[in-house]
Structure formats: structure tokens, C-alpha cells
Amino acid sequence: MTDLTQLQAGLIGRIEAAADVAALEAIRVEALGKSGSISEMLKGLGKMSPDERREQGPKINGLRDAVATAIAEKKAALEAAELDRKLAAERVDLTLPPPPERRGRVHPTMQVLDEMIAVFAEMGFGLAEGPDIEDDFHNFTALNFPPKHPAREMHDTFWLPQNEAGERKLLRTHTSPVQVRVMRGTNEKLPAWIANGQAPPIRVIVPGRVYRSDSDATHTPMFHQLEGLVIDRNIHMGHLKWTLETFTRRFFEAEGVVTRFRPHHFPFTEPSCEMDVQCDRSGGSVKIGQGSDWLEILGGGMVHPNVLRNCGLDPDEWQGFAFGLGVDRLGMLKYGMPDLRDMFGSDVRWLEHWGFSAFQAPNPATGLS
């Protein structure tokens, strides 16, 4: 049998002299591989007599363990030396600027909505909210919509299937149902955050999502609306006119905006009107406060006596006005966005272009400036 001590010394010497991991792996295969010299010795133990196995077995196993330990230690030393070499060769320039951070942008709808809330907060308006899923009474009946009014039809309103009680809910077509909830006050058996009930005088705005079965470049099935409601004694159209003109000048940040009011019809107001602003439509864009064209931007009027009665208020004692405007549409006009549908897309590039820095967010306590 091969002199085990001499074999061990030779293998340990070669292991220590190995220059890299590849050379070390070759020695391991030669000694400990499937057909390696030490592996063959271990296989030969089966052919020995019991006395020879008892004598040679521990020696061969000791040789195998010594060689395996030497290989593992040498491999760790070679890998550490290679890492030190790479680290010594690398250079980090601490003066290089870091890669730019991608900051989030405030969506134009949220920016415009915050701007509107800030303007109305300056005029003393509070905030009210209501549910997106409404019933016929709050969305139509209480607001003086006749039973056969076109707005009740399927092509204008998203109706939900009947429930077990035979009632049909709908996605609200405007934020006006919150007017009813505010004026009815404690008569509404709803949580306080939905009911928003309060006794007159009332001065609130109601921002929120509304839903109509319509879709083109200037209409979407879901959009954002802001409703305004004032209830007090001796309220008249002059108060409505001042409120809307003041809002328009502050929102568009143009003192020279010219407005006009045209008679219109809404079931829930009487008299009713629409407000136009003077603008310039030349050049493929709309510029508010310039030119000689006119553009309708909102509607309003005096709260209809029937609506007041439906909400438990005496129209001989209380009067009020209401108005509604499209948040997304006014944002398009103010900032020149061409297609309303883009505001409901998911293109991050569009948001990076049209979005706002969080530092530009208006504050209801301080207004737009």
C-alpha cells in the first residue's frame, strides 16, 4: 500500500502551492474525486481482511479528512485574496452626482379640486360629503325631477339591479343629493359623516365623483363635480352672481375675466342660469379672459321652493342658491389639457408632464397665494 504519510505530505504541499481556485479544484478531483487516489483507497478497504481494515481504515479516513480540510482552508484564502485584489482595483468617485430621484406628482384633478376648495374656503364655505351610491329619492325626487324626466332613463343613468326589497339604487348623476342630506339634517338616519345635517344658515361646497352614461373627448362616464349650496334668509340672485364671479376671478387668477349669465332650466332651481366666460378660441386652444368668444363653465340658480319643502324647510322663511361645476373640465380650461379622457388614464408620462409638485398644493387656510 502507498505510504500514506508521504502521500499526505505531497498533497498538502501541492494544495498550499496552488495559485488559484481552478488549480485547487484539479487537486481535489485528483485526490477526492470519484476516481481519485484517496477514493480508490477507500474502495479497496472492502477487499482487505478484517484485521487490515481495522488498521488501515482510520489512517485512510484521517488522510481524506486532512486533505479536505486543507483544500477548504486554501480555497477560503484564495477567495479572500481575490476579493482584496478586486477591492484594491476599484475606485469610487464620491464627487459624482447620484442618479436623479423620481418624485411623485400630484394629479391635476386633485390639484384643481384643492384650488377650488381653497377659493371657496376664503369665502367661508364649509365642506360636505355624501355616498356615491344613491337612491331615487335623494338623486331625483327630492330635487324636483318629474317622474318621466329623461335623466331617469337608462341611457343617462347607471342603475343598479333591484335588491331583495325591490328597491333600485343608482350611481349618483350629480353631487346635488348631498344638498338634500345637508338640508334634511337629523331627519336622515345615516352616519354623521354622510348626513352632514345642519340647520340654516348653510354655506357648503360638495366635491365628489359623479357618473353618467356618456363618453367622448369632453365627457367621461365618471368625472368630478363640485356643488355649492347657500341657505339663509333674504338670499337672492345677486348673492349667487357675486359668488360665482368672485370664484371665477380667483380660480383663473385673472381679475379681468368677463362673465355673462343666461337663463336656463334645471329642475332643482328657479330661476336658473348658466354662466359663460369670455375667451379666445383661436389657435386651437382656449384662453380665459381674452378674445371675444364665450364659453359656458357652470350652472346654478335659486333653490326651487319644492326642493326646500322636500327637505323640511319653509320657502317663505328660507331662500338659497345652488351651483355646480365640473372639476375636471375647469382644470382642462385652466391648464390647457386637450382631452378629458387622459385625466382618467394610467400613463405615467402624462402625469409627469401635467402633474404638479406637492409644494404647489394650495392651502384652504391661506388660499391660492
From Swiss-Prot:
Its EC number is 6.1.1.20. Keywords: Aminoacyl-tRNA synthetase, ATP-binding, Cytoplasm, Ligase, Magnesium, Metal-binding, Nucleotide-binding, Protein biosynthesis. One of its GO terms (cellular component) is cytoplasm. Its cofactor is Mg(2+). Binds 2 magnesium ions per tetramer. InterPro entries: aa-tRNA-synth_II, aa-tRNA-synth_II/BPL/LPL, Phe-tRNA-synth_IIc_asu, Phe-tRNA_ligase_II_N, Phe_tRNA_ligase_alpha1_bac, Phenylalanyl-tRNA_Synthase, tRNA-bd_arm. Mg(2+) binds at residue 270. Pfam families: Phe_tRNA-synt_N, tRNA-synt_2d. It catalyses: tRNA(Phe) + L-phenylalanine + ATP = L-phenylalanyl-tRNA(Phe) + AMP + diphosphate + H(+). It is found in: Cytoplasm. CDD domains: PheRS_alpha_core. GO terms for molecular function: ATP binding; magnesium ion binding; phenylalanine-tRNA ligase activity; tRNA binding. One of its GO terms (biological process) is phenylalanyl-tRNA aminoacylation. It comes from the Bacteria. It is an enzyme of class 6 (ligase). Belongs to the class-II aminoacyl-tRNA synthetase family. Phe-tRNA synthetase alpha subunit type 1 subfamily. NCBIfam families: pheS. Tetramer of two alpha and two beta subunits. This is Phenylalanine--tRNA ligase alpha subunit. It comes from Phenylobacterium zucineum (strain HLK1).
